[in-house]
């Protein structure tokens, strides 16, 4: 796995679709591993990811995100989804906090689609 003609072809198709002929393309074995690697790569060491309280990274990945040193910052859910108004309120509260430099900074948002409830 990984060095066969099908994998090579898939890599080339992904590079072409992205317009990045020199890009490294890696295939991962599962969702938790993928979420962990992507989120860790996106975030600085002092940042966390905002997710609905029922989001997969918050409720079903057995601390995989926290294992990399990042915190999952949760907001309310509605049938598994977050509301833009709740996210905005969370971010405004963070930025208005006089001690924001001592708090985990929100650096990414995790959106479940479909949600843990099957909501689209």
Protein language model features and the residues they cover:
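Conserved N-terminal alpha-helix of the aminotransferase class I/II PLP-enzyme fold
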Residues: 1-31, 53-58, 64
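Glycine-rich loop at the start of a catalytic domain that most often binds anionic cofactors/ligands
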Residues: 17, 37-46, 64
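Short coil/turn connectors at secondary-structure junctions
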Residues: 20-23, 44-47, 69-70, 104-107
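Conserved core of the PLP fold type I
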Residues: 24-43, 73-80
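Glycine-rich nucleotide phosphate-binding loop and flanking beta-alpha elements
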Residues: 34, 57, 117
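Domain-start "cap" segments at the beginnings of catalytic or binding domains
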Residues: 40, 56, 62-64, 69-71
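Conserved PLP-anchoring active-site segment centered on the Schiff-base-forming lysine
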Residues: 41-59
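PLP-dependent aminotransferase-class I/II
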Residues: 69-120
